[in-house]
């Protein structure tokens, strides 16, 4: 089976990047599937987690972050140009690979992935609570930018619900936020951390892990 993962880059040391890398490695190494990683803007950045040699990595060299250097109106123009460039390159690679499954993420071009004209089933993973998705960490308090972000999010979520073959969330609560969809699956994150010893529980230290940062 041919499986394509589409993401912006595996350059940050984050939970989402680790999980995606673990999945791709597992599907390629253990199940023997043909796995492809298509990134938009990996560039010369090293992969933040080890990727199996059996996973083929294709970078489309479309640096979306460059649009945010411009004022809002110019952002729209530059953003449209980058989107068009990325869409054409992605469609070309999909035609060449002819995959059975394409997996995307709600944080990156999920609406475009869902509407690709090909035989592949489109699976969209939601690694964040829906109401917090697509909110940039450096978000500026601007009325017009807020309106733009809300519209883009609405459009993306509408298309994901309409065109995706399946939505994968991490928790029951996340799944409920998507409302009525014929094919929602709840798959918690896995861990590949190899623990050699069991804690004695004597150290006066508490570690808390959370997903919501806004």
Give residue ranges: language-model regions.
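Membrane-proximal helix-turn-helix segments that form the acceptor-binding/catalytic region
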Residues: 88-92, 130-132, 144-166
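Carbohydrate-associated surface elements
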Residues: 173, 190
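Nucleotide-sugar-dependent glycosyltransferase donor-binding/catalytic pocket residues
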Residues: 12, 192, 211-214
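Active-site proximal beta-strand in glycosyltransferases
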Residues: 3, 101-103, 116-137, 147, ...
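Histidine-centered beta-alpha loop that forms part of the nucleotide-sugar donor binding/catalytic region
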Residues: 8, 62, 106-107, 126-130, ...
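N-terminal strand-loop element at the rim of the active site
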Residues: 5-13, 26, 30-77, 177
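Conserved donor-binding/catalytic core segment of Leloir-type glycosyltransferases
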Residues: 4, 199-214
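Short N-terminal targeting/anchoring amphipathic segment
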Residues: 90-109, 123
